Design a protein with these regions (language model features):
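A short, hydrophobic C-terminal helix/tail in secreted or cell-surface proteins
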Residues: 4, 235-237
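Charged/polar positions on well-ordered alpha helices
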Residues: 58-59, 237
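Nucleotide 5′-phosphate-binding alpha/beta core
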Residues: 1-55, 61-203, 212-216
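Conserved A3 ("GATE") glycine/threonine-rich loop of ANL adenylate-forming enzymes
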Residues: 198-215, 222-234
């Protein structure tokens, strides 16, 4: 609540106060609160409503972690990170024709959370796609329905069908899954590199996992020296 926030503002005046009042904790320590949030309780870990839970990799005790995602986290961290990366790219590439084409955004899927009304759990990328400004849908591919498909192989085929003949100027996604999609599209079209399919491709935004292990493979499928890559997408944590 705002009253509780005011109390903390008075009690936390510097980093040492913050560290003492809010020490680092493991997922297991906060899990009881997460479970209560998933059951519909509010104002436990954050003062605004929590409706979304990002499903992350497991711990030693659990198969998966369910990380609460607030509206503020979406706006002030994830979407702002994307805007910052785009702004840096435009500053460094003033002749960019980024907006002459569309962005291929590769995401995961989401599902209802414990049958709780208006609450969903899923991949962070799916949560971002679900909540993004509707205007973005006019400048990206594939369709939202296709982007949020659950099963991976049919999803790759559907994305390929929707994007092969599109004018794609930019890519966004996790390097590992994006590479799988790229190879599928190249195999489907019989082409050797993405420039043969999307001649106006100029930038790849990536994140979630390190890009370095995939760098050489990307050089094989994106051969143009004008196409650059930027890391900006945050992971769940």
């Amino acid at each position: 609540s705002s009253a509780a926030s005011d109390v903390y503002k008075r009690q936390i005046r510097n980093y040492e106060d913050f560290k003492n009042r809010l020490p680092i904790q493991t997922y297991e320590e906060v899990k009881p609160y997460v479970e209560r949030l998933r059951a519909g309780e509010q104002n436990l870990l954050w003062p605004s409503e929590i409706r979304w839970f990002a499903k992350s990799s497991g711990t030693t005790n659990d198969k998966s972690k369910f990380l609460p995602v607030s509206k503020e986290a979406l706006e002030d961290i994830h979407y702002r990170g994307g805007k910052d990366a785009a702004a840096i790219y435009f500053r460094m590439n003033p002749e960019s024709r980024f907006f002459s084409g569309k962005g291929l955004i590769l995401g995961g899927s989401h599902a209802p959370n414990l049958n709780t009304n208006h609450s969903l759990v899923g991949d962070l990328s799916a949560i971002l796609i679900e909540n993004i400004n509707p205007l973005v849908n006019f400048v990206r591919v594939p369709s939202k329905q296709t982007a949020l498909m659950e099963h991976f192989e049919p999803k790759m085929e559907a994305i390929a069908r929707e994007t092969i003949h599109a004018n794609v100027s930019n890519l966004s996604g996790v390097p590992s899954w994006m590479l799988v999609l790229i190879k599928h599209i190249l195999e489907k079209t019989g082409k050797q590199s993405l420039e043969e399919i999307w001649p106006n491709l100029e930038v790849l935004f990536h994140g979630g996992v390190a890009f370095t292990p995939y760098r050489e493979q990307y050089k094989d499928v994106i051969r143009s020296s004008k196409t650059v890559s930027y890391t900006h997408l945050r992971a769940h944590e």
